[in-house]
Amino acid sequence: MVSWIWRRLRGKKRSVMAFCLLMVLSAVAVIHFPPGHPASTPGLNPMEPRGEVGASDPRIQQTLNSSLRQPARNLGHWTGQALPRNPILVCAKKQSRRRQVDRSRHPLSVRRDAILSAQDRELLLEGEVRDAGGAALGQPGHNGLVQETQSKTVTMVVPLTERSHESFQAQRDTAAASFRPWPADGRDPLPGAKNGVLTGGKAGSATSGSEAPWWSSSAEDLQKSPWCGTETPGLAGTAAWGQVPPWFMEHDAQTLRLLVHGKVVGKARVPAHGQVLQVGLSAGDALQDISPLRLSQFCSQGLCGLIKRSKDLHEVLSFHLDRVLGLQRSLPAVARSFHSPLLPYRYTDGSVRPIIWWAPDVQHLRDPDEDQNSLALGWLQYQALLARGCKWPGQIPCLGIHHAEWARLALFDFLLQVHDRLDRYCCGFEPEPSDPCVEEGLREKCRNPEELRLVHILVRSSDPSRLVYIDNAGNLQHPEDKLNFRLLEGIDGFPESAVKVLASGCLQNLLFKSLQMDQVFWESQGGAAGLKHVLETLESRGQILLRHIKKHNLTLFRDKDP
């Protein structure tokens, strides 16, 4: 029996030896292979196993499916399933094969992560535009299609507001700081003021000055001021924006720097205004040719302007007149030559054009016939408001605009002879045959006052009790014997601060100094010699207005009066 067993074992000797050798090799493999892989993929913990090839963690799939709702993140955290704690020979072989596959897969996985991260950020950026641009969708130039798109995507961008908004906030603050003017000596031109947001707040604060006018003393004191002299030390001959006159608020200074130096990063047509182009402006080399949705976001943050025709250059002069008089109702405007490849050739042919700041919260009626107004107002209703205000309930609707606003508007329009707002039908003077009111047959409606409508009566949602002035080019060639006194009809008082400036005789010198801040406009008009006539015209009209006030014994009100 023993000899038979021995013969059987000798027959199996080779198999036993092979089995033993295999066991030794498996033991070596178990000892030398670690239970986890090194972190060859960025962001992977060295002790985190990868799992099976082609299998991803459910969290990764959730991230990919919700890329529009989640902030951009590192997609390199592929976690997989854990390996067994007590591997056997078969597991060791599978682990070795899996490691080889992982090595060959690593470059592709990094590339995939980079692509996914870039796509994720791009999608998030578009979602942010739709969300942040919502503030501007109610403004002119945004159609219902965009509004519908925004309404469909708002739920996708809610979770990312914190990080994405902070990113854009930083970009906006950087732009505002870059455009802030500083004097040559390094002093803050507006001591105690802080950088403001270009969208502004109330019309009586960041966007249109404080309640107190820049000059609250008497006309005689203004005459003694260095600003009324023929030259102001440190101002004449200096570079543009070297020193800021006191009638400009900090928001003005920031916005003017934006309009002068901002790089065009996008454009859009303004419906029903073929000669006007809306452009987005940015500091530095941030973006180029941004999408309409991104442009909407720029405009909602106060980083846009309207490029108008060269014939509208006097809107720049009108803006400076508004600030010198302390009215603070016109939107900032500068003259500029454009060279951006994003603009059509007619905008880059070297001609000087005005660019007006785009206020993001100007309200427009949805009625196509009244889209240039914030409220519908006829001439008879306007006269009733001037006569009785809101003291007679049930007689006329109260519009919520301060009574004194109409006096400021009338003074401004009379000096510039702007007819479009209060007398677009030219009922108060004899127009030229080439005037639009004649060419369009509007003057025939003067026979029926009930048909007369006011135009460009606009307010901002930030302060709907105050008017905002647009399209202020006016008519500085209008002869004195044809001045339109209908613009003053029904007005029983004027702002005291503006009347003081007119009575001081300093208007011409103040405007000279103010306009020197816009070197492009100054040079385009031929400097002091070229501007002398138009400034004398404004000075003369101011004296005529003073005589009108004295003749009719009209009152003066302080700027704080509603």
UniProtKB/Swiss-Prot annotation:
Q: Quote the InterPro entries the UniProt record gives.
A: FAM198 (IPR029207)
Could you tell me where this protein is found in the cell? Secreted; Endoplasmic reticulum; Golgi apparatus; Membrane, Caveola
Q: Which UniProt keywords apply?
A: Endoplasmic reticulum, Golgi apparatus, Membrane, Secreted, Signal
Please provide, in alphabetical order, the Gene Ontology terms of the cellular component aspect for this entry.
Answer: caveola; endoplasmic reticulum; extracellular region; Golgi apparatus
Superkingdom to which the source organism belongs: Eukaryota
The principal localisation class reads secreted
Q: In which tissues is it expressed?
A: Expressed in tracheal serous gland, heart, muscle, fat, lung, ovary, liver, kidney, adrenal gland and brain (at protein level).
Which positions carry the propeptide annotation?
30-111, 424-562
Span of the secretion signal? 1-29
Q: Which Pfam families match?
A: FAM198 (PF15051)
Modifications the protein undergoes after translation, according to the UniProt entry: Proteolytically cleaved. Cleaved at Arg-112 and Arg-424 leading to a processed mature product of 35 kDa. The cleavage takes place in the Golgi apparatus.
Which residues are marked as site: Cleavage? 111-112, 423-424
Q: What are the start and end residues of every segment in region (Disordered)? A: 179-229
Q: Which family does the similarity line name?
A: Belongs to the GASK family.
Full protein name = Golgi-associated kinase 1A
- Organism per entry: Mus musculus (Mouse)
